[in-house]
From Swiss-Prot:
Name of the protein in its database record: Cilia- and flagella- associated protein 210
Region (Disordered): 210-237
Tissue: Expressed in trachea multiciliated cells.
Coiled-coil positions: 184-254
PANTHER family reported for this sequence: CILIA- AND FLAGELLA- ASSOCIATED PROTEIN 210 (PTHR28663:SF1), COILED-COIL DOMAIN-CONTAINING PROTEIN 173 (PTHR28663)
Location in the cell: Cytoplasm, Cytoskeleton, Cilium axoneme; Cytoplasm, Cytoskeleton, Flagellum axoneme
Alphabetical list of InterPro entries matching this protein: CFAP210, TPH_dom
Organism: Bos taurus (Bovine)
Subunit structure: Microtubule inner protein component of sperm flagellar doublet microtubules.
Keywords: Cell projection, Cilium, Coiled coil, Cytoplasm, Cytoskeleton, Flagellum
Main function: Microtubule inner protein (MIP) part of the dynein-decorated doublet microtubules (DMTs) in cilia axoneme, which is required for motile cilia beating.
Gene responsible for this protein: CFAP210
Length: 547
């Protein structure tokens, strides 16, 4: 439908216009909905239409103008901010410059502080190294060998000073014999004190060696006692294991007796169930016989009903034939309306009779169907009861089998638990023995490692001491070579400065006697100072002699 400006001149024009619209719907699209009566359409001029449209769209145009103005202002503001962003003669620019200058000053101060911290750390590290070196030097000077070496150094210097004083006194007073004798006595006394001191040190070394031997013997006795205790513990563990096995055998025998008794009771219960099942089966057979008799009677009644129905049908057919014959005779004899009415009445009576017979037949059929449904329901109930009884019997049997299985599983779990406990006890004993052996081996290894580290530390300390002593001896020997014997004696290895072999296994001990090998066994000495056991003075005194 197309509406144009102007007035209509008639229906034919509208029809032609409709035809054109139907032929070309694309060029002139409809401006109004379909099925609109053009007589109800108001036609307005174009100016009026523009005025109405402007009045309707004025708010939208004003809102669009406002949005455009706000957008233009915002864009101008952003451009202004972008332009003045890097200006330095504004408050924001000066503030940013001050912040950057402050940040730069803070970074410089932080860099200076870091440099000072690094220098302080380096200085403290150097101080710590100096303190560590001083402590090491002090600790080195506090060792026994260094003290003995310093004592020898002091003795050497004292002897040198003493000789110098003696020479000075000799050059000053050559005629004083008494002074010389006194000096000689002092020297002899000093040598005597030295010999006594050496003898005392020798006795101390012998006592120390005896103490070491005693400690070694005590360690061996302790090891033997520990080994005996371990053997005793092992025997006790074996005895406990044998007692445990005997007890477990007793428990297993008792469990077997309980299992046999449970099995006997179970078989008795099964026998009773079989008897009950036979009685129930006999009762079920009797009930089945009754049902079969009932079904036979029902079948006989059904057969009789069918025979009666067939007889009834035969009688009806005979009567229908008689009636048809009678009607045919009447039709032949009379063809008037009265005969037709009578025939119609007879047909209606026959139809009514057939209807009653059919209803009776339907009723009998419904009764027979109800009887069959009742019989099927009874049979179904019997079958359902039988199935339910079989299901209950099966469930009861499964419950018994499940209980028996649970019982055997419980017994198996108990046996497994007992075996597991026995294995755990055995494993615990084995682990304990292995732990003892491992601890002993670990202790031995730790002792060996300790001895090795001790020997390495002793070797390092000995090297450091020898270097220090060599430097001191070389510096002292430059002035005089006469009094460096105490220094050489203090430098010699081994306690007491012995001349025997170095015993590595005994902590670097160097005995003061000759030995055959590194074991330290003393060789026989042919020049004995005297008999050790033949004291003739005691023998003569015991015999009564006085000379």
């Amino acid at each position: 439908m197309l509406v144009r400006f102007g007035r209509r001149s008639g229906q034919a024009k509208e029809s032609a216009e409709m035809k054109n619209c139907e032929e070309d719907p694309v060029l002139y699209p409809p401006l109004l909905p379909t099925k609109v009566d053009l007589r109800q359409v108001t036609i307005i001029p174009h100016n009026e239409w523009e005025r109405i449209r402007d009045s309707l769209d004025s708010l939208t145009r004003e809102a669009a103008c406002l949005r455009a103005e706000r957008k233009a202002k915002k864009e101008m503001h952003l451009r202004s901010q972008e332009v003045v962003k890097h200006w330095t003669n504004t408050y924001a620019g000066m503030k940013e410059q001050k912040l950057e200058a402050k940040k730069k000053r803070d970074e410089e101060i932080e860099a200076e502080r870091q440099i000072l911290d690094i220098e302080e750390a380096i200085y403290k590290q150097g101080e710590r190294k100096k303190a560590i070196e001083l402590a090491k030097q002090y600790q080195f000077y506090q060792t026994e060998r260094v003290k003995n070496f310093h004592s020898g150094l002091l003795l050497s210097r004292v002897m040198k000073e003493r000789d110098a004083q003696i020479e000075f006194q000799k050059s000053k007073i050559k005629s004083d014999k008494k002074w010389e004798e006194q000096v000689k006595l002092n020297v002899e006394k000093a040598f005597k004190e030295e010999r006594e001191k050496a003898e005392k040190q020798r006795r101390e070394r012998v006592a120390l060696a005896k103490d070491h031997l005693k400690q070694i013997k005590e360690h061996e006795e302790e090891e033997e006692r520990r080994r005996k205790e371990e053997e005793k513990d092992a025997e006790e563990i074996k005895r406990q294991n044998s007692l445990y096995e005997i007890e477990m055998k007793k428990k297993q025998g008792k469990k077997k007796e309980e299992i046999n008794e449970s099995r006997r009771l179970f078989f008795e219960h099964l026998n009773d169930k079989h008897i009950i099942k036979a009685v129930e089966q006999q009762q079920q057979e009797e009930e089945d016989e009754k049902i079969r008799k009932f079904i036979k009677a029902k079948k006989r009644l059904t057969q009789m009903g069918k025979e009666k129905e067939a007889e009834t049908h035969r009688l009806m057919e005979e009567r229908r034939k008689r009636i048809n014959n009678f009607l045919s005779k009447l039709m032949k004899e009379k063809f008037d309306n009265e005969d037709l009415i009578i025939a119609r009445d007879i047909a209606e009576a026959e139809a009514e009779w057939e209807k009653r017979e059919r209803e009776k037949y339907e009723k009998n059929k419904a009764e027979l169907k109800a009887i069959a449904e009742h019989r099927a329901l009874v049979m179904k109930n019997k079958e359902e009861e039988e199935r339910q009884r079989k299901i209950e019997a099966t469930e009861q049997m499964l419950a018994i089998l499940k209980a028996d299985q649970i019982f055997w599983e419980h017994e198996k779990e108990k046996k497994q638990k007992a075996d597991k406990e026995r294995r755990e006890v055995q494993d615990a004993h084995i682990q304990q023995m292995a732990k003892h052996k491992f601890n002993a081996l670990q202790a031995k290894q730790a002792e060996s490692e300790y001895c090795r580290l001790t020997e390495a530390l002793v070797a390092e300390k000995e090297k450091e001491f020898q270097d220090y002593a060599r430097e001191v001896i070389e510096s002292e020997s430059e002035s005089t070579k006469k009094y460096i014997y105490p220094l050489v004696k203090a430098v010699q290895e081994g306690p007491g400065g012995g001349r025997g072999p170095v015993l590595v296994d005994r902590g670097g001990l160097r005995p003061s006697y000759q030995a055959n090998d590194t074991t330290g066994v003393q060789l026989p000495f042919y020049n004995s100072p005297g008999s050790k056991y033949n004291n003739f003075q005691k023998s003569k005194g015991r015999l009564g002699f006085t000379w």
